[in-house]
């Protein structure tokens, strides 16, 4: 029978159904057709619907395949058959997953259900509570079972490859679906993919006797019949036959082609029954696990790694048969364990490790490095801190001991390394995994899957170290290892923290490091802390910040290697020994690097000059550029991309993208420059690195040392600062920026070394001193100097960026340097023309007009002609003719005779004379009659050689200079370059600087650029012709957009000056001649930009959003540029919103209901959370009644409990008068000055009362009648409930009340932070379950909590102060 067939059923009587529940015989079990699967469910409660008259049953789906709908309450109608006096209901197999706590702290019931479905492909198998812990082992250590699966498949591949003609083996690797042999395609990638599918079945085989599921499964089979593979496939109902196929086939080979999986299960059942008969099942059940594990080990060829007590291979039947012959059979089959004897450590282990890693010629750098390696490897000191200069070789201090530990066969050590930034992960894993000496994997694998039994070293970042999942796994290490590996010889080795000074110096990240204090440091054999910039004071504070005791009070010399007598207290309580190699060696660090401090007009321009010069001298070298902001990083990358290959990184990129880009720069030899913020200055080791350039005006001494320290073998470090703009200020408590002056002296002061100010040897690699530099570095400096002199003499002014780079608009920069190929070609032509004019004038035009043409020919053509093209006849000619008469004739007469006449004699005869006759008619004849004969004719012949004659004749009449220069752009380039090369200027012509172009060509290029930009934007934002919003652009579904939509967000949401410039296009904020909007565009780019800004606000608190507005300052006047910047991280923002607002969507979409009883903190800390729904409503109406009587200003009251009077507000007849009353008393002004409303436009809050929130207003006004009925039902004197404007004032006041928000989010655990007013208003209208399970709107609960914070006027008690006191509640804006 089906419930959906209404013709066979009729409504059930409530009383009859209630009695039927007491008599189970009257109930008919029926699968629910309301579910996607036919899953039996359980009746939890039922009630009679007054409207429909149906009895409705509340039931639970506990095993649904759709995880999002698991444990969801479903209401179905109960029907009774006309011919059958029995009721249809729904039941469920035990146990009840929702009832009672699961005896495992790792898994929740939903995950258990997923585990069961993954393993068995069914939902209705019975298992007891002991099975929970067994099944949890799979999730805790999935990595271990994955690794075993990989080994199984590799072993099978080897067998099949060795016996290709064996039909049985080939049948093992034949896909029964397609019938095609797949052994040939079973490559490494395929092995790993199928290994993941095999892992659950591998787990089953190893734990076959520990699960009661198999007992129930075998008990359902008739007699002692074995189950063959095909029967198993049918019974387990696999959705993917490939999973069962591989498992059954591999079991076939493993069990000597005799046993099948069904045989294993049947054997397990027979052994269990025999043991049960003997009454001693519990001790002997473990023997099957030992037998199965031993078979796997032998079959995989791992006998050398494990020691078993078996003398020969025995199958399950042998075990059963042998039971009768021996009563103590369980004593003969012992648990598989690793070899117990421990191999001793020796100093020779370190030397052997070094030879494995670096070859037979390995030697330590110095005696200090040798002794430290021995200290770490041999000594019992539980915690060691090392400070060594950058480039010293700190990595080898733990790398060699790790290799030595891995060589020991008695114990498996698992160690962990943590670095501060994601960008260092790739470099660390490449370095530590080279030569195959260590098995290295990311820490994320350990956190998600557990220890795989193979990895020697896990590498992660500080965030992984502070994560709860990591600390929990370390806390449960002993239990996990014992249950998974059947041995206690897998131990935790070293905990290594690199650059640990960041715990103290990274002020903005210190809140993220709080979880490290929960880590069980005592579980590790040793903790090692390394840094190049951690003096004693910094090191001691950093260690105490993560929960350790700190440094030993007495500084320990490296030569004092005596062992400590008191190690019983554990690592966390024992002081850390500090080895300060910098003080021991008494050498100032970074002396091998040439450090140059330069003040320049334009940092990017100077940096580009240096980089081009470096790559001219050393084409295979690499460089790092450290910028001050993330915006500057992207802009430099865009503008420099046409000169060399660039990789850029900053903190806003995703973790995977950072790792990928860092790895690309380290491994790809063609990559030249790495541009990033300061995160690229720590820990990266690049052999080809020869230059570091720092553009950050706020570098502190640690950032400087770390950046210069990247130059391991010497090189050049440039600190470029803009003139008169050095920022000498602290950043929120961090170290102050470095000062102008000697860098070496500041480094000495930081490390506590003796000052040599004013003494011999003060300058080491700085201030022009080269005495301590290597010969290669000195040679590089000299070659750079010679190249700079050659550029100066050749008059090659490289203008890579505008001089006002920092002040210019970001979008203009991106439009100029980061456009399409067509734009790039335009720039190249412009630069080529400029260089052509420069070289042509130097060789030919030198004798034309003035003596300064030789030196300033580029500026003459680029600036004067463009600017004064119309006035050339009147002003330019007159001025230059004066100089021509005075100086040029004297100076250039020799050059004209020597070079120009010889070169241009042929062209002068045919073209120039006839051409210039028209040219000199009006302008040149009068002034240059003396020079025309000698210089003008020869000059024109050079510039108008073949193709410009016709154009010159027409245009020279008005301005000879401008037209001639314009026409030589196309025709003279080839000849000019040849002439320049003949003159010996080939070296200078390799550079093509960007210069200005004349006005006419600029207009043509500008229009082309606008059209091109318009097409690109239309392709990037194709749906702007429709009613598109930024959430659609990010990829959200329509049902999600409905609740996340940004109601009330318009241009007034933006702060003053952000996308609000006047006199420009309203759609794109560009000049009308450069407008990129297109016809038919309904949604402007400006609107998309302010919506994108609102999305960023969704993800940031007040302080973070304020900093973000400062970061995007270059885009304040460029919404199109900001949209491009926003779209780069489109996927990351989408994921962030999905993660941060999952709870919000679940609540607003009514998929989850807030219950105050689920909030433990609320029940303990607030009387409101123990009130009934009736009491909450009474309190709500009482608050509004008091406000109305006292004529209190509503918004101000809910903002900070200030009971100011505002009679006009209560007497207002419409919204306009209401808002005017608020503005008159200064409410909006106080709101902006006291709260985060100041981060929006001045009219933003005011306009919330006008056209926004229409749907919510309609919904609220419809509910006013319900409020009146509630007051009558409660016996309260009916009072006028607040109208919409007063109600909205309440919500706005609560939203900007920081004290109230913090308290509510603390008490009500189901909600989190929202940072947009429309989301807050929407959230306030959801319903919550009060303590008596009655529903009340959330805003009523908010008002009750707000009232509780202000007074003791609540029923049955007063407020228990937990977080905030009443005195501090007045400080709203702090």
From Swiss-Prot:
Give positions of region: Disordered.
Answer: 321-345, 832-999
- Induced by what? Induced in absence of telomerase TLC1.
Which InterPro entries does the annotation name?
A: DEAD/DEAH_box_helicase_dom, Helicase_ATP-bd, Helicase_C-like, P-loop_NTPase, Sir1_ORC-binding, Y'_ATP-dependent_helicase
Residues that coordinate or bind ATP: 388-395
Q: Where is the composition biased (Low complexity)?
A: 832-975
**GO molecular function terms listed in the Swiss-Prot or TrEMBL record:** ATP binding; ATP hydrolysis activity; helicase activity; nucleic acid binding
The Helicase C-terminal domain covers 609-758
Does the keyword section mention Isomerase?
Answer: yes
Residue ranges annotated as coiled coil are: none
**So what does this one do?**
Catalyzes DNA unwinding and is involved in telomerase-independent telomere maintenance.
Q: What is this protein called?
A: Y' element ATP-dependent helicase YLL066C
Q: Which organism is it from?
A: Saccharomyces cerevisiae (strain ATCC 204508 / S288c) (Baker's yeast)
């Amino acid at each position: 029978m089906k419930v959906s067939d209404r013709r066979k059923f009729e409504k059930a009587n409530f009383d009859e159904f209630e009695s039927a529940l007491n008599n189970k015989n009257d109930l008919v079990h029926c699968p629910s057709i309301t579910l996607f699967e036919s899953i039996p469910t359980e009746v939890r409660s039922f009630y009679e619907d007054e409207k429909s008259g149906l009895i409705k049953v509340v039931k639970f789906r506990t095993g649904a395949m759709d995880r999002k709908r698991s444990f969801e309450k479903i209401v179905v109608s109960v029907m009774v058959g006309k011919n059958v006096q029995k009721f249809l209901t729904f039941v469920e197999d035990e146990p009840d997953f929702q009832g009672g706590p699961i005896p495992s702290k790792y898994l929740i019931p939903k995950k258990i259900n997923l585990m069961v479905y993954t393993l068995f492909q069914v939902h209705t198998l019975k298992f007891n509570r002991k099975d929970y812990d067994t099944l949890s082992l799979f999730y805790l250590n999935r990595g271990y079972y994955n690794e075993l699966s990989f080994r199984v498949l590799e072993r099978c591949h080897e067998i099949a490859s060795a016996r290709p003609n064996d039909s049985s083996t080939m049948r093992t690797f034949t896909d029964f679906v397609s019938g095609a042999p797949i052994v040939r395609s079973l490559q490494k990638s395929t092995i790993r993919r199928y290994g993941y599918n095999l892992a659950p079945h591998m787990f089953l085989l190893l734990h076959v006797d520990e699960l009661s599921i198999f007992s129930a499964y075998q008990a359902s089979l008739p007699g002692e019949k074995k189950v063959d593979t095909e029967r198993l496939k049918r019974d387990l109902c696999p959705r993917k036959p490939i999973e069962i196929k591989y498992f059954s086939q591999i079991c076939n080979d493993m069990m000597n082609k005799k046993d099948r999986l069904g045989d294993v299960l049947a054997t397990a059942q027979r052994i269990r029954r025999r043991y049960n008969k003997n009454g001693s099942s519990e001790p002997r059940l473990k023997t099957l696990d030992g037998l199965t594990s031993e078979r796997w080990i032998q079959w995989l060829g791992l006998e050398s790694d494990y020691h078993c007590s078996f003398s020969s291979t025995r199958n399950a039947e042998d075990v059963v048969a042998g039971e009768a012959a021996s009563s103590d059979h369980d004593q003969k089959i012992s648990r598989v364990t690793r070899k117990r004897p421990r191999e001793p450590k020796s100093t020779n282990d370190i030397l052997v490790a070094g030879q494995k890693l670096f070859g037979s010629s390995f030697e330590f750098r110095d005696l200090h490095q040798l002794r430290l390696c021995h200290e770490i490897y041999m000594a019992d000191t539980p915690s060691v801190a090392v400070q060594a200069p950058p480039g010293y070789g700190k990595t080898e201090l733990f790398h060699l001991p790790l290799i030595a530990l891995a060589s020991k066969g008695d114990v498996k050590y698992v160690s962990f390394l943590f670095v501060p930034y994601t960008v260092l992960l790739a470099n660390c894993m490449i370095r530590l995994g080279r030569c195959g000496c260590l098995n290295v994997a990311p820490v994320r694998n350990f956190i998600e899957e557990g220890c795989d039994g193979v990895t020697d070293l896990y590498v992660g970042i500080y965030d992984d170290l502070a994560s709860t999942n990591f600390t929990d796994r370390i806390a449960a290490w002993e239990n996990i290892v014992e249950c998974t590996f059947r041995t206690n010889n897998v131990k935790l080795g070293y905990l290594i923290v690199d650059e640990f000074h960041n715990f103290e110096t990274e002020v903005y990240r210190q809140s993220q490091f709080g979880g490290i204090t929960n880590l069980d440091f005592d579980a590790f054999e040793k903790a090692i802390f390394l840094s190049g910039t951690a003096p004693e004071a910094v090191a001691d504070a950093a260690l105490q910040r993560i929960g350790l005791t700190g440094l030993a009070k007495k500084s320990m010399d490296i030569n004092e290697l005596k062992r400590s007598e008191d190690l019983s207290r554990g690592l966390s309580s024992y002081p850390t020994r500090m080895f300060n190699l910098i003080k021991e060696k008494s050498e100032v660090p970074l002396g091998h690097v040439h450090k140059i401090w330069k003040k320049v007009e334009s940092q990017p321009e100077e940096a580009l000059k240096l980089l081009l010069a470096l790559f001219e001298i050393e084409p295979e070298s690499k460089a790092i550029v450290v910028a001050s902001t993330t915006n500057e990083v992207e802009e430099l990358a865009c503008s420099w991309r046409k000169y060399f290959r660039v990789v850029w990184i900053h903190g806003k990129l995703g973790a995977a993208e950072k790792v990928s880009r860092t790895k690309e720069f380290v491994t790809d030899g063609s990559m030249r420059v790495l541009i990033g913020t300061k995160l690229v200055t720590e820990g990266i080791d690049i052999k080809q690195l020869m230059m570091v350039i720092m553009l950050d005006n706020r570098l502190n001494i640690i950032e400087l040392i770390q950046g210069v320290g990247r130059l391991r073998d010497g090189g050049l470090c440039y600190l470029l600062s803009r003139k008169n703009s050095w920022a000498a200020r602290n950043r929120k408590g961090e170290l102050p920026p470095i000062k102008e002056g000697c860098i070496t002296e500041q480094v000495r002061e930081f490390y506590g070394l003796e000052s040599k100010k004013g003494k011999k040897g003060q300058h080491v690699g700085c201030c022009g001193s080269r005495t301590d530099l290597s010969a290669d570095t000195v040679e590089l400096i000299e070659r750079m100097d010679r190249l700079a002199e050659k550029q100066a003499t050749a008059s090659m002014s490289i203008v890579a960026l505008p001089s006002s780079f920092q002040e210019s608009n970001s979008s203009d920069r991106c439009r100029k340097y980061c456009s399409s190929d067509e734009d790039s070609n335009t720039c190249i032509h412009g630069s080529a023309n400029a260089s052509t004019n420069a070289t042509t004038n130097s060789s030919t035009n030198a004798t034309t007009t003035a003596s300064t043409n030789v030196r300033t020919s580029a500026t003459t053509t680029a600036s004067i002609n463009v600017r004064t093209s119309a006035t050339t006849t009147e002003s330019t000619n007159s001025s230059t003719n004066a100089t021509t008469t005075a100086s040029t004739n004297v100076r250039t007469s020799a050059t004209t005779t020597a070079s120009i006449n010889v070169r241009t004699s042929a062209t002068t005869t045919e073209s120039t004379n006839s051409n210039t006759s028209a040219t000199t008619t009006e302008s040149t004849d009068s002034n240059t009659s003396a020079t025309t004969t000698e210089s003008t004719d020869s000059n024109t012949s050079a510039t108008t050689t073949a193709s410009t004659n016709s154009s010159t004749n027409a245009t020279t009449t008005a301005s000879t200079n401008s037209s001639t220069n314009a026409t030589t752009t196309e025709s003279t380039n080839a000849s000019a370059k040849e002439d320049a090369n003949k003159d010996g200027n080939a070296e200078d012509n390799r550079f093509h600087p960007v210069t200005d172009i004349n006005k006419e060509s600029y207009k043509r290029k500008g229009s082309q650029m606008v059209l091109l930009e318009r097409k690109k934007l239309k392709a990037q934002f194709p749906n702007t012709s429709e009613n598109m919003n930024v959430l659609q652009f990010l990829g959200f579904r329509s049902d999600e957009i409905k609740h996340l939509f940004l109601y009330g967000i318009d241009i007034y949401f933006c702060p003053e000056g952000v996308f609000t410039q006047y006199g420009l296009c309203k759609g794109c904020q560009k000049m009308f001649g450069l407008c990129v909007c297109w016809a038919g565009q309904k949604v402007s780019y400006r609107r998309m930009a302010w919506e994108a800004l609102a999305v960023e606000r969704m993800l940031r608190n007040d302080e973070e959003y304020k900093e973000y507005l400062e970061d995007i300052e270059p885009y304040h006047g460029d919404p199109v540029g900001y949209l491009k910047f926003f779209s780069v991280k489109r996927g990351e923002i989408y994921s962030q919103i999905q993660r941060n607002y999952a709870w919000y969507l679940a609540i607003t979409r009514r998929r989850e209901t807030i219950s105050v009883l689920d909030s433990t903190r609320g029940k303990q800390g607030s009387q409101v959370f123990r009130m009934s729904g009736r009491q909450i409503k009474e309190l709500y109406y009482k608050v509004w009644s008091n406000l109305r009587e006292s004529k209190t200003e509503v918004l101000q009251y809910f903002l900070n409990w200030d009971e100011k009077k505002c009679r006009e507000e209560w007497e207002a007849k419409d919204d306009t008068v209401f808002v005017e009353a608020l503005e008159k008393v200064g409410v909006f002004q106080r709101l902006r000055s006291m709260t985060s409303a100041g981060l929006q436009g001045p009219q933003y809050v005011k306009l919330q009362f006008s056209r926004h929130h229409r749907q919510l207003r309609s919904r609220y006004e419809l509910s006013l009648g319900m409020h009146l009925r509630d007051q009558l039902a409660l016996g309260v004197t009916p009072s006028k409930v607040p109208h919409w404007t007063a109600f909205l004032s309440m919500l706005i006041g609560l939203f900007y009340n920081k004290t109230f928000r913090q308290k509510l989010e603390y008490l009500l655990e189901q909600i989190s932070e929202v940072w947009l007013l429309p989301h807050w208003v929407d959230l306030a209208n959801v319903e919550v379950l009060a303590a008596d399970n009655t529903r009340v709107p959330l805003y009523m609960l908010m008002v009750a909590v707000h009232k509780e914070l202000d007074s003791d006027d609540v029923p049955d008690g007063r407020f228990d102060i937990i977080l905030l006191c009443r005195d501090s509640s007045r400080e709203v804006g702090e």
